[in-house]
Amino acid sequence: AGTVGKVIKCKAAVAWEAGKPLCIEEIEVAPPKAHEVRIKIIATAVCHSDSYTLSGSDSEGLFPVILGHEGAGIVESVGEGVTCVKAGDRVIPLYIPQCGDCNFCLNPKTNLCQKIRVTQGQGLMPDKTSRFTCKGQLLYHYMGTSTFSEYTVVADISVAKIDEAAPLDKVCLLGCGISTGYGAAVNTAKVEPGSTCAVFGLGGVGLAGIMGCKAAGATRIIGVDLNKDKFTKAKEFGATEYINPKDYDKPIQEVLVGLTDGGVDYSFECIGNVKTMRAALEACHKGWGTSVIVGVAPAGHEIATRPFQLVTGRTWKGTAFGGWKSVESVPKLVKEYMAKKLKVDEFVTHTLPFNQINESFELMHAGKSIRCVLSF
C-alpha cells in the first residue's frame, strides 16, 4: 500500500563477481512497469543452477547479479495492464514463462515459451532495463526471477498464482527442482507402469525423478550415486535399489545392463556431467530404452556415444522444467502437494535465515543438504 509506485529499499544477496561469496547488501528495487509484477519474496531455496552461474561456468552468466530462481512470495504491486495477478496474491516466480501466444506456447509438445527469452538471457526485463540498483550500480536480473532479494520484479507472464493456503517456505521448491525431476519422468519420458528406471544423481532433482517414476508405476527404480549416504533418502522417495559406480571396476552402464536383463526402460541423468549422460544412454535397453538429460552440463561440453546406440532403437531426449507449461501447471502441482499426492516437505533438509545464504551453498557443495530454504 505505502510502497506502491515507489522505489523499495531492501536486503538482497548480490553476486558482485564470479567465484566469490554472495554479499548481503541494501539495494533499490524500482516499481513495476507495464506488464510487470513486484513481489515480496517470503522464502527461496538454493539450487545447483545458482551455484553453477556463481562459479563462472555459465556462458550466460552476468555480474553483478541477483541470483535465485526457486522462490515464493506475495504480490506487492503490479504495473499497468496486468490482469493475471493482483496485490496480495500468493505467487511463484517462473524462470520459464508462459505467454500463451508464441508458437512455442501454442505447441503442445513444448513448454519453452520464447516471448522474453532474449532479454531474460541478457539479465534484463523485457524493455531491456533492470529494476535493481545497488550503490549507484545496475544489477542484472537472473533467469527472469532473482529470488535472492526481499523484493523482485518479474514479467507478468513469469508468475503463477497459487493456492493462498499453501506454505510458501515449502512450495517455493516447485519453482524448479521438484517440478523438473518429477516432470522429466511423467511428461518427458512418459514412464509406463511396470517399467525399470535408473536415476543418475540423487540430489533434489534426482529424488524428484524417482518420485515421478514411482507415481507413473515403475516397478524397479535404481538410484545411481557416488555418495552412499544418499540412498536412505532415495528409498523414502521410491528407489528400490542403489548402485555406486565406485563399487565396480567396469563402466556403470555395463553393470546396469547386467542387472536389468539387457538394460533399463528409462534412465535420467540428473547431474549435468557429459560422461554420465553417455552412461545413462548406454544403460538403456536395446530397441526401446529412453534416456532423458535433466542436468545442465558446463558451457562448451559435448556429449558422445556411438551412433549404433541410437540406430539400435534407443532414444535420447532432454527436458527443461520437466516439460510443464509453467503458468497453467505450477498451480496444479501446488494443489497436488496440498492434496498430499506430491512430496515437497521431505526435500527440505535445512532452513536458514536469509543472511546465512553462503552457508546454504556450502551445505549443498558438501552434499549435506537436498534443499536448504532461506526465509526473510
UniProtKB/Swiss-Prot annotation:
Its cofactor is Zn(2+). The record marks 117 as: Important for FDH activity and activation by fatty acids. One of its GO terms (biological process) is formaldehyde catabolic process. Homodimer. Its EC number is 1.1.1.1, 1.1.1.-, 1.1.1.284. It catalyses: a primary alcohol + NAD(+) = an aldehyde + NADH + H(+); a secondary alcohol + NAD(+) = a ketone + NADH + H(+); S-(hydroxymethyl)glutathione + NADP(+) = S-formylglutathione + NADPH + H(+); S-(hydroxymethyl)glutathione + NAD(+) = S-formylglutathione + NADH + H(+). The keyword Oxidoreductase applies. The lineage of its organism: Eukaryota, Metazoa, Chordata, Craniata, Vertebrata. Zn(2+) 2 binds at residues 99, 102, 105, 113. Zn(2+) 1 binds at residues 47, 69, 176. Pfam families: ADH_N, ADH_zinc_N. This is Alcohol dehydrogenase class-3. InterPro entries: ADH-like_C, ADH-like_N, ADH_3, ADH_Zn_CS, GroES-like_sf, NAD(P)-bd_dom_sf. It comes from Scyliorhinus canicula.
